Amino acid sequence: MRLHDLYPFPEERKTRKRVGRGSGSGLGCTSGKGNKGQNARAGGGVRPGFEGGQMPLQRRLPKRGFKNMFAVKYEVINLARLLAAFEGKAEITLDDIYDRGLCSLGSAVKILGEGDVTTAIKVEAHKFSASAVEKIRNAGGEAKALEG
């Protein structure tokens, strides 16, 4: 038996729905659309969200707030994860973080303070939490915040 000889069993293949082909097929006559009415007609049916003339939910609810298109979205990395990825390294740059795959390329990075710093390290990122800066400085290291 070769790869081109493989085929699914006939009962495993789902047959398409053939409508309007006689009453013996189970989908003859009205073709599964029921009797008369808007949904039985060609091109029939109502648009999404239509509630039969009642004021739709989308219009009943008030508009609120807005999305700030200039908001900066930071990808967060905890100190524990950062130190595990760069064990024994004294200086961690933003390019190192991107190369190691800790966050997606070009994204803004924020370092959070979960984990313990035992050695002096120099870390480069866009933002740091207060606890992360404190832990890095207490270990004799430096937290360098970048612009952008």
Curated annotation (Swiss-Prot):
GO terms for biological process: translation. The keyword ATP-binding does not apply. It holds the Pfam family Ribosomal_L27A. Keywords: Ribonucleoprotein, Ribosomal protein, RNA-binding, rRNA-binding. GO terms for molecular function: rRNA binding; structural constituent of ribosome. PROSITE patterns: RIBOSOMAL_L15. Residues 1-57 are annotated as: Disordered. GO terms for cellular component: cytosolic large ribosomal subunit. Residues 21-35, 42-52 have a biased composition (Gly residues). InterPro entries: Ribosomal_uL15 (IPR030878), Ribosomal_uL15/eL18 (IPR021131), Ribosomal_uL15/eL18_sf (IPR036227), Ribosomal_uL15_bac-type (IPR005749), Ribosomal_uL15_CS (IPR001196). Part of the 50S ribosomal subunit. Binds to the 23S rRNA. Belongs to the universal ribosomal protein uL15 family. This is Large ribosomal subunit protein uL15. It comes from Nitratidesulfovibrio vulgaris (strain ATCC 29579 / DSM 644 / CCUG 34227 / NCIMB 8303 / VKM B-1760 / Hildenborough) (Desulfovibrio vulgaris). The lineage of its organism: Bacteria, Pseudomonadati, Thermodesulfobacteriota, Desulfovibrionia, Desulfovibrionales. The gene is rplO.
